Each structure stands twice: as structure tokens, then as C-alpha cells.
């Protein structure tokens, strides 16, 4: 049987891609879907459970040609095609192409150093304007999508689940006993320079004599960058005030870690770390975001309490760690941790684009 939907999952993301594969196979018609995954470990684990998971080590235009019979809906989870490859897609393929946007897809810097590069990127954007649909897990990306690709392409909202939902989180929280009274400050969620760790360290230096711990999540990203920021933080605050996470954690371990966090700082303007922020918001942590960023505007629009990164270093430590509102609105985060809501979003998407 030829599947109705082929999913191209180039990013080795055992959490978000893996959970979506599980969600679709267990709540929808599995025979309608084929999943091409780029991660070998994820393939080995998932293929033991599901027959529709295929390992694909190379993702490029020829990969689409390899699997496309002319009938399937081609769903790209994070854009792996280059601007040149997008320009080479035939109209009949564009009309069956669905792009599920990941944060870096929209906001990574593109090379426009020459007129030729600019024209190529412009043509690629026009091509995307003709595809079957764009899917945004973060609904506030829609403005950027419309700005770049026009108003004609249909845009739908479907959220990538983490595999843990409201009831699961609540259960972990109920059974977790915090024993460390120090103020725990989480800076970023990975080892990427856009998180501006060094800038944040300089702002936090004012509080280095306070009873605090800085948590650095460095399990993925740029290894050289990770080494550098650990060195910088060690010099500035001392190793005894650092909690550095180099290894991947289970979601149970990660949520327990978040239970210990008091303050989370994410200083960037584009969309990223959305799943992390949803969990932190639901758990009632004090979140600092860039006041010029899309994440800050989104949470403010949803009436969820967030604070400006510009205040860090200007206010007292007591002000830094104390929330203005004790009973904050967690409805936004709660809706995105609702399993039935997420299933409904994806079911509706497949019914609409199929």
C-alpha cells in the first residue's frame, strides 16, 4: 500500500520527531504514514515498534525524488532543502509539499552577500509561497511566514508534543521533594551562541556573592562554544556555583531539574526553546526574555507572566528572583500540554491537506 503521507525528518530529534511518530501511529491510521528519519539511534528504537519507520542517512532534493511516486503528500519536518534545491522543485511537487516549520528554519541568517545569492533566496521564497501548506507549531510564527512567503499559502497550527503531558508533569511535581534552598538560575537550553550566555553572565556578575546556582544545559549544540562558556562561567562565579548538564536527560529527569529552577533566562529575538518555555511557564518559574523578541510578545499576548532581560543586573537580587504575581495565568502553557488538543490539531491537519 502506498502511504498517503511521507514524513521527511532530517533533524535527529528523538524527542519531538520520535513522539510525533508515536502519536500518529497510536492514535491515527498508521498505514497512511511513512516516516524517514535521519537519526540512526532513533530509527533502531522506533523501528522495533513501528513498521513504517525507515532510516534515511541523506536528506537532499534527490531524497524526495527517491521516495516520491507522484501521489503522496510530502511533509518536511524542518526545511532541509537548500535555496537552490527549492528552486529546482517541479510545480506538481510543490503542490504536494507541506513544510512543518522549526524555529531555526525561519530565523537563521541567510547568505545575501551577492546579487546572485539574493535572487536565489528570493526565488526560493516565491517557490515556498506556492506549496500546499505551512505548519507552525508556534502560532506567532505566522506573521513572519506571511511576511516572507505571502498571503496565498495556507498556514495551519500543530504543536510538537514532548511526550509528557499535563497529568504526567503534575505527577512528577507531586512526587518530587526539593532539598536545595539556593536560588537556581537556568541560562539558555543548549550550547548555541544566539543564547548569549556571556552577555547574561556579565549581567549576573552583580549577584555572584549571592546564594545561587547557575544551571547550563549543554547536552546539544556547539561543543567548542560549550567548553568556552563553562570556562567563562567558572572564572566569573566559581565552579561551586555551576550545575553543568552535558548528557541528555530523560524527560522525567528534565522535569525534576526544572522543579529546582527558580529563574530562567532566554535572551534572543527569534522563536526557539518553545517547549522549554512552556514547561517553565506551567511550573510557575520566573522567566526573563528579550523584550524585543517574538517569544516575549507571545507570552504577553497570552497573558502569561514574563520579565525583561534588560532588568538583569539593574535590580536587586531579591527583585530578580521574586515574581510580581504569585498566581500567574498558566492557561496558555496548559493548553499546549493537553494531549487531546495536540492529537486533534494533527488529525485536523491531515484531513485538511490529504
Locate the predicted segments by residue.
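Short N-terminal targeting/anchoring amphipathic segment
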Residues: 64-83, 96-98, 263
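Membrane-proximal helix-turn-helix segments that form the acceptor-binding/catalytic region
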Residues: 114-134
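A conserved mid-protein helix/loop that constitutes part of the nucleotide-sugar donor-binding site
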Residues: 15-19, 192-206
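A charged, aromatic-enriched C-terminal amphipathic alpha-helix characteristic of glycosyltransferases
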Residues: 316-354
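Nucleotide-activated donor-binding/catalytic signature segment of Leloir-type glycosyltransferases, i.e.
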Residues: 229-248
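Conserved donor-binding/catalytic core segment of Leloir-type glycosyltransferases
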Residues: 172-195, 214-216, 334-335
Amino acid at each position: 500500500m502506498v502511504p498517503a503521507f511521507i514524513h521527511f525528518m532530517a533533524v535527529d530529534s528523538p524527542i519531538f520527531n520520535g513522539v510525533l511518530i508515536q502519536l500518529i501511529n497510536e492514535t491515527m491510521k498508521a498505514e497512511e504514514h511513512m516516516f524517514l528519519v535521519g537519526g540512526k539511534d532513533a530509527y533502531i528504537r522506533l523501528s522495533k515498534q513501528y513498521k513504517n519507520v525507515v532510516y534515511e542517512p541523506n536528506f537532499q532534493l534527490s531524497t524526495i525524488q527517491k521516495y516520491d511516486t507522484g501521489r503522496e503528500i510530502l511533509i518536511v519536518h524542518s526545511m532541509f532543502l537548500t535555496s537552490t534545491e527549492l528552486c529546482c522543485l517541479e510545480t506538481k511537487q510543490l503542490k504536494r509539499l507541506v513544510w512543518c516549520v522549526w524555529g531555526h528554519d525561519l530565523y537563521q541568517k541567510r547568505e545575501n552577500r551577492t546579487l546572485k545569492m539574493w535572487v536565489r533566496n528570493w526565488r526560493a521564497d516565491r517557490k515556498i509561497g506556492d506549496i500546499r501548506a505551512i505548519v507552525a507549531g508556534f502560532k506567532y510564527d505566522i506573521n513572519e511566514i506571511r511576511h516572507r512567503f505571502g498571503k496565498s499559502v495556507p498556514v495551519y497550527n500543530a504543536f510538537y508534543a514532548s511526550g509528557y503531558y499535563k497529568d504526567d508533569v503534575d505527577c512528577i511535581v507531586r512526587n518530587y521533594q526539593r532539598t536545595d534552598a539556593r536560588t537556581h538560575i537556568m541560562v539558555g537550553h543548549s550550547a548555541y551562541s544566539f543564547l548569549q550566555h556571556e552577555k547574561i553572565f556579565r549581567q549576573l556578575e552583580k549577584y555572584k556573592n549571592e546564594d545561587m546556582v547557575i544551571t547550563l544545559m549543554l547536552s546539544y549544540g556547539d561543543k567548542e562554544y560549550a567548553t568556552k562558556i563553562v570556562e567563562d562561567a567558572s572564572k566569573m562565579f566559581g565552579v561551586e556555583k555551576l550545575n553543568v548538564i552535558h548528557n541528555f536527560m530523560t524527560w522525567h529527569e528534565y522535569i525534576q531539574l526544572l522543579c529546582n529552577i527558580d529563574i530562567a533566562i532566554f535572551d534572543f529575538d527569534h522563536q526557539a526553546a518553545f517547549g522549554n518555555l512552556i514547561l517553565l511557564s506551567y511550573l510557575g518559574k520566573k522567566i526573563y526574555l528579550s523584550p524585543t523578541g517574538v517569544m516575549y510578545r507571545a507570552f504577553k499576548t497570552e497573558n502569561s507572566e514574563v520579565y525583561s532581560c534588560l532588568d538583569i543586573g539593574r535590580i536587586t537580587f531579591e527583585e530578580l528572583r521574586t515574581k510580581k504575581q504569585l498566581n500567574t495565568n498558566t492557561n496558555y502553557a496548559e493548553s499546549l500540554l493537553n494531549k487531546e488538543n495536540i492529537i486533534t490539531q494533527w488529525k485536523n491537519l491531515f484531513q485538511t491537506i490529504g
